[in-house]
Each structure stands twice: as structure tokens, then as C-alpha cells.
Amino acid sequence: MFVLISTLLSIAILAGIYHLSSKREQQHARKYQLLTLLRDVVHLLRHHRAATHYSLQFQQNDQQKLDALNDALTNKLHLLVETSRFENKPMYRVLQIKVGKLLEQWDDHSVARNQMEHGKLIRHCLFLMDEVTIAWLAVEQRDDLHNEYHMNWQNIMDSLETLTQLRISIQDLEEQGGNERFKNYASVMMRKLNQLAVIAPLSITSPASTRSIQTLNEYVTGSHVDLTEAELYGVTSDLSLTIFNTYDHVLSDVVESLYLPLPRLSLAG
């Protein structure tokens, strides 16, 4: 009788451990998938911004590319809503609605507003990614990772805010004081990039990043001031990629420490 009770008790304990382990694995898998999907949405939005910017700037549509990006974004956002927990679905639906509105209305925007609207949605996604990551770190009680991640996150968001101001100032270059305003934001941007270099040196030393930093430096020092508006937007696009790659580096380190390495992004660039 004692042996039977001991056996049943052991089975119950093992079943409980298995249940908890299975539940924890499901929680890990859901957070991992949410971050992966949000990361893909950011990447696709960046590509959509570049494609629509080209269309608005030069009045030429690459309709096949735009259709492919629309389909990919629509699919990713649907998966995002489906993957999220019931109580979190509304905030992902808000993102889905906002992106859908942009996909329908971007061709009514000016070049500057198109840049700003895409930037808002990209930051929206990054804040959602931050929320998932912070919650994951809290559940796992990884205070060591949390503190480092939070510090890096602040530097990255400060850099994004500076980049937004730099982008906005491009449209005002021909106005009184516009050139000095752009130079001021360019100087601040270079300082922010130096801070990011401590976080992810490889992101800052990429060819596109190095070229853009050099161009900004030449503009600030006055040795290269004959850049067109299109060229300046190109510089800010390269810097946007640099900042995104820096955050991707930070996020990848955290997620790999908690669960698994993040997959390679499906689109290059």
C-alpha cells in the first residue's frame, strides 16, 4: 500500500512539473513569436517607407513591390493579432488599423509627412517590442539583463527622436535659419551615433553607416553643403537602418539569453 501511494505521489509530482514546464514553454514561445512578428513589421515598414518615398519623390510607382509589401504587412499584422493573448489583442489591433490606414492613404501625403507617418508606426512597434521584452525579463527575474537593456533602450530611443528632428529639418532647409537648424541636429545626431557605437560597434561601422556619418560630418564642417533633399533623405534612411540594427543587436542578445536566438530577417537591408 505504501509503495502504491508513493508511486501515485511521484506520478502526480511529475505531472505537475511537466504541466508547469509545458506552460512556461508556451509563454516563452508566444513572447518569442510576438517579438519576431513585430520585428518583421518594423523591417517591412522601413522598406515600405523607402518605396513610397521614391514614388512620391519621383512620381514613379514600383507597383509590384508595393503590392508585395502590402500583402506581407497585412499577413504579419494578422498573425500578430492572432498570436497575442486575449487581453492584449486590442493594442495589436490598433497597430493593425493604423498600418492599414497608412497603406491606403500614403499617396495623399507629402514626402515629409510620409516620412513622419512611417516613423510614428515604426516607433509604435518598437514600444510594443519593449513592452514584451520588459515583461519577459520581469517574469524571469533577470534584473541584470533588465538594467542593461533599459539603458541601451533609452539611448536608442533618444537617437530615433534626434533622427526624426533631423528628417523634419530637411524640408525647412530653404527657409531662414533652416541650414543652421539642420547642422545643429546633424551635430546632435553624430553624438548620439557615438553613444550607439558603444552598444553595437559593428552596426556603426557598416559601409552605409560610415558613409552617412562622413556625409553628415562634412555638412556640419561646411566642406560638403551642396547635397540635394533626396540625398539628405537617403542619409537619414541609412542612419535609420543603423539605429534599427543597433536595437536588433540588443534585442537578439536578450532573447537568446532568455530562450532562443532570433531568426534572420526575411528581407535584406
Indicate where each model-derived feature is located:
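Hydrophobic alpha-helical segments
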Residues: 1-269
